[in-house]
Amino acid sequence: ESLKNDKGNSLLIAGSNNPNVQMLVNKINYQLGNYGQTIDTDNVIELYKGDDVEIEEFKNELLSGDLDGVIFYGSNPVYSHPEGKQMRDAISSLDLSVSFSEYMDETASSCQFVCPDHNFLEAWCDHNPVSNHFSIQQPLIRPLYNTRQAQETLLVWTGSATRTNSESEAFYNFIQKYWLDNGIGDQAEYFDFSEFWNWTIHNGFSNSQNELTQEALVFNDVALGSSNNDASSDWEFVVYQKELGVGHHAANPWLQELPDAISKIVWDNYITMSPSDCYKVFGIDDSNQKSAWDGIHLGQEEKAFVAKLTVNDIEVKLPVYPLPGQKSGTVGVSMGYGRGENNEDIGKAAYQCDEFGNHLDNGDGGLVPIGANAFRLCSFKDGHLSYNGFGNISATNERYSLAGTQTHHTVMGRTSIVKETTFDFWKDNFEQNQEAYNPKIKLHSKEKGAHVEKDATEYSLWEEHPVENVGHRWGMSIDLTSCNGCGVCITACHSENNVPVVGKDEVRRARDMHWLRMDRYFSSIEDDNRKNWAKAKHEGDFNYADLEIPEENPSVVFMPMLCQHCNHAPCETVCPVGAT
């Protein structure tokens, strides 16, 4: 009803690759009047243009022996395809197999030839992420190793270019000629192509003025097909993507140590489920909410429970993180983990370590991957890759240590930590609200033998340093309404300031060294019942212990805590939602 009453101001998103689900969501958005309001059809997103049907056809031809050779660029199907293990054996038996992977990943390890590509920081390239927007990727450094850009290699192999040396500009010249021949960008605005090209390189992009011809949107009442999900099992699972991505960056310690936006867990993969489901699966008495919440453990002070998720014949065993707000009967597993399970050389950060920082041995001389490969749970249905389905969950007797950067999970007093109100209320009551929403901190001291109380801003550890005449000074405010806790600012700060990565065990000891912290708070089951923050002044039936228990479907608040001493802060410029 709330969507109907506020037409044109909402947005429904399909969490499935199933065309029937997407058409249904599109029809609902149409009925709600969202097209032309919250949905812009004039700007076409050109990202993720893969074709699931072609991938499935390739897999079938590969497994049936109908292929003689294959070249892999920017893909790793042995890891990311549900039937990757079968594909690995088939690739090894081909007459020709080539990979352009930067390192010996799961697919490259099965190929006859590996021609390592430049890192993207070492290479020229061009991109068209959105219609009429074309950008240029420039190398920041010369290649560190003896690598060759994949595009240039293909040009040489096809006889379209000649490689001169390691600093060959064959692909750069190809890009330049392609832009000239095809009229890419706003070339008509410049005197000649040379001037246009120099400005494009300088600015990094060029926008085309060509008007796109969009076909008219037609929504009819044709019956949609089934979603084809087999609901014979009790649990619905979802394979989702978080900060680590789809697996390309599993060896990046910055991202491994970046706390998940919601769970705040680092260096691990896990199964998420609602707290109420945790009580049932692990046999925890929930008659007392506080003892039940304490009993499911968050894996920091005590080891987390471990569960086994079974989908068809695939089993995944992972620690469990109880996630407030998750729908009962569902579980979530993140993709991007479980790299290098066949002893491939993914990178040191992709494998588990003991408390002393030494890699764990799998018993066969190899290393133990972090987490499990969730792509094995996916399946192809009617030509599309499905990231959700149904399976079974069972408890195990095992326990596992998780590392989190935050163990206090609720606001514990919304009025004292998070100041929330509407702009109109704030504006209409500005004089009164200045003190109410941002109270001044008082400090107590003695002056001339008498007790005095002053604002904290009147005290300083340092000698007086006037700043009135120093000109512009850096300062930053953060719109908490826009902030979604993604953590991009944390990694930018980590990189800019060469902050050490300490590893999982040190994070468990609360020794993480991030200069910027992203706190996440859930609303508490008792928060609305408290009349006053001061316990002595509180009136009515109220339990302070229950403030530690999140609501079943809580509100979520993100609050960054910054270092407050950076004059050219990268956290300001990288925010993807413009909250800074």
At which residue positions do the language-model features occur?
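A cross-kingdom feature strongest in bacterial/archaeal respiratory oxidoreductases
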Residues: N43-L47, E56-L144, S160-R163, K177-M518, ...
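Non-catalytic, well-ordered alpha-helical segments in soluble enzyme domains
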Residues: Q149-L180
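Anionic-ligand anchoring segments at beta-strand to alpha-helix junctions in alpha/beta enzyme folds, i.e.
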Residues: M23-E57
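Long, well-ordered, tryptophan-enriched scaffold segments
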Residues: E1-S16, K27, N34, A150, ...
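Ferredoxin-type iron-sulfur electron-transfer modules in oxidoreductases and energy-metabolism complexes
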Residues: E464-W474, K504-M561, H565-T573, G578
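Flexible glycine/proline-enriched surface loops and loop-helix/loop-strand junctions
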Residues: D6-N9, F134-I141, I262, P554-M559
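Feature representing long, continuous alpha-helical segments
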Residues: N26, E56, N60, G65, ...
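Gly/Ser/Thr-rich loops at beta-strand to alpha-helix junctions
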Residues: N17-V21, P77-Y79
